Amino acid sequence: MLSWLLVFSILVLLAQGVSSWENPQTDQVSEGLQQLFGNISQLFEKGILGRDDVFTMVSREEWGAEAIGCSSKLSRPVDVLVIHHIPGLECHNKTVCSQKLRELQAYHIHNSWCDVAYNFLVGDDGRVYEGVGWNVQGSHDQGYKNISLGVAFFGTQEGHSPSPVALSAMKGLISYAVKKGHLSSKYIQPLLAKSEDCLVPPQKGKQKKACPHIVPRSVWGARDSHCSRMTLPAKYAIILHTAGRTCSQPDECRLLVRDLQSFFMNRLNACDIGYNFLVGQDGGVYEGVGWNNQGSKTDSYNDISLSITFMGTFTGSPPNAAALEAAQDLIRCAVVKGYLTPNYLLMGHSDVSNTLSPGQALYNIIKTWPHFKH
């Protein structure tokens, strides 16, 4: 069975005075698409979606594209397929969909991109529209554009999932891409990309800070230590849990981090606490050994990975929303600051060591995060 890496994101296109697709109801559409695509492998297995579904390709010339201005080439086959959904460009026939694509291309070029952001676009009319094509990098996703094909659904009625003919066209396009060697059939792992991970301008007033507040070692009362240095930028972000008590208040969390450091140094004879950063149920991020020093909990990955541990046990129930958001913000921060490579891989502790960490409930969540690799 062919294995697919599907990255799903809601692409929010924002510019004043262009058209109604500037202010989509992203939450509603996102949830629907996540549910729709979550079982895509099962649809293949059950025969609901055939591997050889035919599709009609509309060339750039046919839909009236401006001359392409992109020059960065893709090396084939790529390992990643990034599927987006563009809300607000409703169309159900070739004429209207072509007009919407011309508007979209003009918007992207106006925002200093070299062309329309995607390799291909699938209209709700069931046609596949050529974007920058098979051999050129799109601008659809900062972390994947040089190793992926970016394909976007467009034309759907706001609040609805793509039509059956659009889904069939998408499946046909994917099958064709694999058969022709444009897309690798190697399995990696499904993951979920948020809109802020794309290259699209975020909505005003909703842009996240580059980094969360990190409680420094001096504030939680760390002991001095001298650990081996990291090899930066790290290639991996590894998620763990401490498998002990948790904390929901800053003073509790500071005490817990101190106790954990003492356990590592006194009982395990480690150079310091075993993690680069720790996350509490108070939504706080606590500096462990920090950006530049190695942790001691990820075996042969210590020097090339950032270890982020949730304080507590998360086998049955996951961390709360504040803690999960803090960890995701920290990962984004690491990329922005250059401590983590943009093409990093995210893994659970159990993926690199014989352990139950980070707990099944937490693991089920992180495997939907960007860059996850089992």
Curated annotation (Swiss-Prot):
| Signal sequence coordinates | 1-20
Kindly give the SMART domains that the UniProt entry links to this protein: Ami_2 (SM00644), PGRP (SM00701)
Q: Which residues are glycosylated?
A: N39, N93, N146
Report the SS bond pairs. C211-C333, C227-C271, C247-C253
One annotated GO biological process: defense response to bacterium
Q: Which Pfam families match?
A: Amidase_2
Q: Which domain of life is it from?
A: Eukaryota
Which InterPro entries does the entry mention? Amidase/PGRP_sf, Amidase_domain, PGRP, PGRP_domain_met/bac
Q: Where is the N-acetylmuramoyl-L-alanine amidase domain?
A: 76-212, 233-359
Q: Where in the cell is it found?
A: Secreted
The answer to keyword DNA-binding applying to this record is no
Example of a GO MF term: zinc ion binding
Stretches that traverse the bilayer: none
Region annotated Interaction with murein, chain positions: 294-303, 354-355
The record ties this protein, via PANTHER family, to: PEPTIDOGLYCAN RECOGNITION PROTEIN (PTHR11022), PEPTIDOGLYCAN RECOGNITION PROTEIN 3 (PTHR11022:SF12)
- Self-association state and partner proteins as the record states: Homodimer; disulfide-linked. Heterodimer with PGLYRP3; disulfide-linked.
- Identify its protein family: Belongs to the N-acetylmuramoyl-L-alanine amidase 2 family.
Q: What is this protein called?
A: Peptidoglycan recognition protein 4
Give me the gene this protein comes from.
Pglyrp4
